[in-house]
């Protein structure tokens, strides 16, 4: 039964009956087609393989539009952070951790979490009268490699600022979806072992720079016997932080125990040097193109 002038039928019951018949006929045709296709594929398995190969669901990820400013010829070029890895220095990173001015309790609680996650951290409460440039100069003289600033607003941690010393760059991330350790069901207790680092899906030149940032604040010699791993998974320019421990159940099976916490980072700004020239900044109009990602 074809769909013609049935929509103009004024009798509601009659109209519903006709639409039900049309729907039933379409379902009948679909089931007949599926039975016929299944019979053909049983006789020739190659037809099924070809159908599954061609039947690829379109997602935002596989229809991604790459940033036209990324040139493949320069995608592997060095950035400011690459010099850190080329310096052949075996010294572990030394991190100076602080907060914004007049921070509240939530910022200090999050600082305790970062002290547990990042090795070789020195935390200092932020005082009035010290500008960021002055703090950076003091940290450089004391051989700190990075500054991490916890940004808090209205008693809530809203972002993280990373400054690589001595010449930058500076990263500002918005922080969201924070879940405390105690709210994670079945969480474990972390140990003092240096964790492994897994970076996933950082594909563009900007994404590689962000990945090198996280590589530079964690030592390159993890304690394998600790079985702890930090995962930073980039999906649609949102960076998901997770921390787990491998749990060996027997000689063949292995599981994961989450250690926590959970939070999400989104890059908002990348600046050269110590908060100098803006190299990249996220703008609201960038969110209009849902298939275009920058990391």
Swiss-Prot record:
GO biological process: maturation of 5.8S rRNA; maturation of 5.8S rRNA from tricistronic rRNA transcript (SSU-rRNA, 5.8S rRNA, LSU-rRNA); maturation of LSU-rRNA; maturation of LSU-rRNA from tricistronic rRNA transcript (SSU-rRNA, 5.8S rRNA, LSU-rRNA); ribosomal large subunit export from nucleus
InterPro entries: Brix, IMP4/RPF1
Sequence segments annotated as region (Disordered): 24-47
Region annotated RNA-binding, chain positions: 254-271
Superkingdom assignment: Eukaryota
A Pfam family annotated for this UniProt entry: Brix
Any single GO CC term annotated in Swiss-Prot or TrEMBL for this entry: preribosome, large subunit precursor
Keywords: Nucleus, Ribosome biogenesis, RNA-binding, rRNA processing, rRNA-binding
UniProt main location, coarse: nucleus
MF GO annotations: rRNA primary transcript binding
Brix domain boundaries: 93-276
Compartment list: Nucleus, Nucleolus
Ranges of Basic and acidic residues composition bias in the record: 38-47
Summary of the function given for this chain in its UniProt record: Essential protein. Required for biogenesis of the 60S ribosomal subunit.
Subunit structure: Part of a complex that includes BRX1, RPF1, RPF2 and SSF1 or SSF2.
Note in the entry: Present with 784 molecules/cell in log phase SD medium.
Protein name, UniProt field: Ribosome production factor 1
The encoding gene: RPF1
């Amino acid at each position: 039964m074809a769909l013609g002038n049935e929509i103009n039928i004024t009798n509601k019951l009659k109209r519903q009956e006709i639409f039900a018949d049309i729907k039933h006929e379409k379902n009948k045709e679909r089931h007949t087609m599926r039975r016929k296709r299944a019979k053909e594929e049983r006789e020739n398995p190659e037809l099924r393989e070809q159908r599954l190969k061609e039947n690829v669901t379109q997602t935002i990820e596989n229809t991604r539009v790459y940033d036209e400013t990324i040139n493949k010829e320069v995608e592997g070029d060095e950035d400011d952070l690459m010099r850190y890895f080329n310096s052949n220095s075996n010294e572990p990173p030394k991190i100076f951790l602080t907060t914004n001015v007049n921070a509240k309790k939530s910022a200090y609680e999050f600082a305790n979490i970062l002290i547990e996650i990042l090795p070789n951290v020195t935390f200092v409460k932020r005082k009035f009268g010290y500008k960021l440039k002055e703090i950076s100069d003091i940290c450089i003289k004391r051989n700190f490699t990075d500054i991490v600033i916890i940004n808090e607003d209205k008693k809530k941690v809203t972002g993280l600022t990373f400054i690589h010393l001595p010449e930058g760059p500076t990263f500002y991330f918005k922080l969201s979806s924070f879940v405390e350790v105690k709210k994670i069901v079945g969480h474990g207790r972390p140990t003092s072992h240096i964790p492994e680092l897994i970076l996933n899906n950082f594909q563009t030149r900007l994404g590689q720079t962000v990945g090198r940032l996280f590589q530079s604040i964690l030592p390159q010699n993890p304690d394998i016997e600790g079985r702890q791993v930090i995962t930073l998974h980039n999906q649609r320019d949102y960076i998901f932080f997770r921390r787990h421990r491998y749990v060996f159940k027997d000689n063949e099976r292995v599981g994961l125990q989450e250690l926590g916490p959970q939070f999400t980072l989104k890059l908002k700004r990348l600046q050269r040097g110590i908060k100098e020239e803006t190299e990249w900044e996220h703008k609201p109009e960038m969110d209009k193109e849902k298939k275009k990602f920058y990391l």
